[in-house]
UniProtKB/Swiss-Prot annotation:
Its EC number is 6.1.1.4. This is Leucine--tRNA ligase. It catalyses: tRNA(Leu) + L-leucine + ATP = L-leucyl-tRNA(Leu) + AMP + diphosphate. It holds the Pfam family Anticodon_1. The gene is leuS. It is found in: Cytoplasm. PANTHER family: LEUCINE--TRNA LIGASE, MITOCHONDRIAL, LEUCYL-TRNA SYNTHETASE. It comes from the Bacteria. The keyword Protein biosynthesis applies. CDD domains: Anticodon_Ia_Leu_BEm (cd07958), LeuRS_core (cd00812). A motif ('HIGH' region) lies at residues 42-52. ATP binds at residue 637. One of its GO terms (molecular function) is leucine-tRNA ligase activity.
Length: 872
């Protein structure tokens, strides 16, 4: 037996043994309750970072715990393997995307296996594998059959030099292409969408079912769905039979409309534009349509517009108001038109100030209209009194309506209902529920993604690829230049096919799917990953789902999680699933931060100095010698503050890295990397190693004493079972790994300080410590368990249950106070009642001295804690 803790040797040994034993394979015993533990699968970039290590360690602890608690556990891993980086690698290095991706997968799989994670690799999937994207394509066809997939024109980022579509991340802050440097244009292309809006109400309402999700994530999703109840109103165009439809959540402000705004893409722009304004409007539209949505709606940019020369009629007042076109109105939102009410909307207020448009206040704060008579003179008359109230900024709060005809004097709440009712009766409006959520654009004009499985036939239209012809395989004989649009569209031998329905010459769809499609159902495939006959066997998937614990970053709070919920509901409605939500509990782990240096005189936080170039004891700019400032920031290559997992493992071992990551911060908080704290965890594991190996080396044979345990034995047994209780609660309730490890440290200290190391209680403590340590530091726990003479794996042991009787102390410490000041503490029987506690307190010699000659006015007894004498 080696007296030294050598993590490198024992970790390699046990990882190999666990594979041979099949210890991590998914158990299928139906008599056990199931537990599905899942981390969000990674993109195969080729190297793990500390964020990965934290994510997968958290899930691994949970999976190991649940196995020991008697659950059959599914803990799989896969690869979110389609995406732009592989295509860029093909362009830059001449390496086929598949080669680059699979090479990275091999490398990262080895890195993950080096972490000793209890992953069932038999369930591994890669979204770029035809075995996987065959079923991605099949699911798309389910959407198509259900009427949930359709095509329409939508704007894309277009590089006019390379003649190709760009992703948003390929456009820099100046609106230029990352590769050619050309100013990016907006271009309309026919694209595929999924009707997620059909599920908007259910996606919103079912957030209430997600009691195991962080509230902030649910709020983010609710805001993204963006349900609002408002009014649909029609403004007739002067000189035309057409009407401009607007949607507003503030119909109570309609009497304050001073202009109407159309989106530049609105089909009525040509009709409302006068001849004198045509050239100005055309120029403006050209400028705006080349801007991204983010640019147009950015809060910090002034909103721009141009008058069309046309006018619309406010249906409530009969007054004509000018029609404008503005960059901040998007055709995809609402009706593509808004009513401008500058007095009661901040954005409209700034726009009106910039273009000198009227600002008419029609709502006022209740206190500001207290002196006005806003009652109609009769039931048939309107309030005629004009209320002159102005504010120096937009008044956006609810209030009392003024200068609003028959609705003057009403509260905003009452007026909204009355105005919508009036508009409905008159036929120029109605109540309307609207969502911020828009249908999901899934088309990508790129190669490295799942091909959309449809064929375009001049006779039959859109024809689904028959199931027997799936998957539509990505061709390998493709040239990657970064120019000329989608590589697939340029490969005629792949594009040109006969129509499956009529046999006429037809063409394949050349768009591939958004990679979010792949990750919207992978958790379902894990439950039946080797099924070649169907997407998954419903009985298996319904058995394992929903995922009991999902772990991933807050950056996926909206899109990935929302799309996964959407897919689950659609597949449920297609009869494949029998549950509503995919993820029972969600843990969004914090970021891993490293110490970062910057020179405040040389670009500040925009110019980081790599930490390996800095002396941490005297941080100075290596070029100028100037003092550097430091802060903790998320680890990244650009900041030069990353810590390579393999370096930490080589120096300290996997278990130390796990222990540090789990101990340093609660899982939902950001974690600051600190080498000194890593050392601290290494020292703790060394102490545990010595504690157990010394016990084994002593060769003691625990005495099988009969009768009462000694006081020291009772105290030690109390410490043991207190640790069991605390660690279990910390792991089951809120996953407070840091406090659970603190309890292990307490138990270790109690065992170190204990007398009677030949007692059965001490043996119980040693064995319990190793078992409790197993989910956190699996390798050292396994080695120590074997050294203790056990033949079976520690990870197959039953998780210990605490004995409530062991937690009850024979004696407790009673604090005695006089007038609230502590004067003594004494040991008393734990079962003593109030009268007995007061008696013991009065008998204390120290207290008697403080009570001598004084009148006791009151005695306060708090059972199990204190006695307080109030004296005069």
């Amino acid at each position: 037996m080696d007296s030294r803790y050598n993590p490198a040797i024992l970790e390699e040994k046990w990882q190999k043994t666990w594979v041979e034993l099949g210890l991590d394979k998914t158990q299928t015993q139906s008599n056990k309750p199931k537990f599905y533990a899942l981390s969000m699968f990674p993109y195969p970039s080729g190297s793990l970072h500390m964020g990965h290590v934290r994510n997968y360690t958290i899930t691994d602890v949970i999976a190991r715990l649940k196995r020991m608690q008697g659950y059959r556990v599914l803990h799989p891993m896969g690869w979110d393997a389609f995406g732009l980086p592989a295509e860029n690698a093909a362009i830059d290095r001449g390496v086929p995307p598949a080669n680059w991706t699979y090479q990275n997968i091999t490398q990262m799989r080895q890195q993950l296996q080096r972490l000793g994670l209890s992953i069932d690799w038999d369930s591994e999937v890669a979204t770029c594998s035809p075995d996987y994207y065959k079923w991605t394509q099949w699911i798309f066809l389910q959407f198509l059959q259900a009427g949930l997939a359709y095509q329409k024109e939508a704007a894309v980022n277009w590089d006019p030099i390379d003649q190709t579509v760009l992703a948003n991340e390929q456009v820099d802050n100046e609106g230029r292409s990352w590769r050619s440097g050309a100013i990016v244009e907006r271009k309309l292309l026919r694209q595929w969408f999924l009707k997620i809006t059909d599920y908007a109400e259910e996606l919103l309402n079912d957030l209430d079912k997600l009691t195991g999700w962080p509230e902030r994530v649910k709020l983010m999703q609710a805001n993204w769905i963006g349900k609002s109840v408002g009014a649909y109103l029609e403004f007739p165009i002067v000189g035309s039979t057409e009407k401009i439809a607007v949607y507003t959540t503030r119909p109570d402000t309609v009497y304050g409309v001073s202009y109407v705004v159309l989106a530049p893409e609105h089909p009525l722009t040509k009709q409302v534009t006068s001849k004198t304004q045509q050239a100005v409007v055309d120029t403006f539209i050209q400028e705006v349509t080349n801007q991204s949505e983010l640019e147009r709606t950015a809060e910090d940019k002034p909103k721009r517009g141009v008058a069309t020369g046309g006018k619309a009629i406010n249906p409530f007042t009969g007054e004509e108001v000018p029609i404008w076109i503005a960059d901040y109105v998007l055709y995809e939102y609402g009706t593509g038109a808004v009513m401008g009410v500058p007095a009661h909307d901040v954005r409209d207020f700034k726009f009106a100030q910039r273009y000198d448009l009227p600002i008419d206040f029609v709502i006022a704060a209740p206190d500001d209209v207290a002196g006005f008579d806003l009652s109609p003179t009769s039931e048939t008359e309107e309030v005629t009194q004009v209320v002159q109230i102005e504010y120096n900024q937009a008044y956006t709060e609810p209030g009392i309506l003024i200068n609003s005809g028959a609705f003057t004097g009403m509260t905003s709440t009452d007026a909204k209902q009355a105005i919508v009712k009036y508009a409905t009766e008159k036929g120029f409006g109605k109540e309307r529920i609207q969502y911020r959520l828009r249908d999901w654009l899934i088309s990508r004009q790129r190669y490295w993604g799942a091909p959309i499985p449809v064929i375009h036939c001049p006779n039959c239209g859109i024809v689904p690829v028959p199931d027997k012809d799936l998957p539509v395989i990505l061709p390998e004989e493709v040239e990657f230049t970064g120019r000329g649009g989608s590589p697939l569209a340029q490969l005629e031998s792949w594009v040109n096919v006969p129509c499956p329905t009529c046999g006429s010459p037809a063409k394949r769809e050349t768009d591939t799917m958004d990679t979010f499609i792949d990750s919207s159902w992978y958790f379902l495939r894990f439950t039946d990953a080797r099924n070649e006959a169907q997407v998954f066997e419903s009985a298996k998937t319904n058995d394992w789902m929903p995922v009991d614990q999902y772990v991933g970053g807050i950056e996926h709070a909206i899109l990935h999680l929302l799309y996964s919920r959407f897919f689950t509901k659609v597949l449920r409605d297609r009869g494949l699933l029998n549950f509503d939500e995919p993820f029972e509990r969600l843990l969004t782990q914090g970021m891993v931060q490293g110490l970062t240096y910057f020179n405040p005189n040389k670009g500040g936080k925009d110019k980081w100095v790599p930490s390996h170039l800095v002396n941490p004891n005297d941080p100075r700019d290596p070029q100028t010698g100037e003092p550097l400032q430091r802060l903790y920031a998320t680890m990244s290559k650009s900041k030069g503050n990353g810590v390579a997992p393999e370096d930490v493992i080589a120096k300290y071992g996997v278990d130390t890295a796990r222990m540090f990551i789990l101990f340093k911060a609660p899982p939902e908080k950001d974690l600051e990397w600190d080498e000194a704290d890593v050392e601290g965890q290494f020292r703790f594991l060394n102490r545990v190693w010595r504690l157990v190996t010394d016990y084994v080396a002593s060769g003691v044979n625990p005495k099988n004493k009969s009768g009462e345990l000694s006081k020291s034995e009772k105290d030690l047994r109390r410490a043991i079972h207190s640790a069991i209780q605390s660690v279990t609660e910390d792991l089951e309730d809120e996953y407070q790994f840091n406090t659970a490890i603190s309890e292990l440290m307490k138990l270790s200290n109690a065992l170190t300080d204990a007398n009677g190391k030949d007692s059965r209680v001490y043996a119980e403590g040693i064995h319990t410590l190793v078992v409790l340590l197993a989910p956190f530091a699996p390798h050292i726990a396994e080695e120590l368990w074997q050294l203790l003479g056990n033949s079976e794996s520690v990870h197959t042991q039953t998780w210990p249950a605490f004995d409530p009787a062991a937690l009850v102390a024979d004696e407790i410490t009673l604090v005695i106070q006089v007038n609230g000041k502590k004067r003594a503490d004494i040991q008393v029987p734990s079962q003593a009642d109030k009268a007995e506690l007061e008696k013991y307190a009065r008998e204390s010699e120290v207290v008697q001295r403080h009570l001598e000659g004084k009148e006791i006015k009151k005695v306060i007894v708090v059972p199990g804690k204190l006695v307080n004498f109030v004296v005069g």
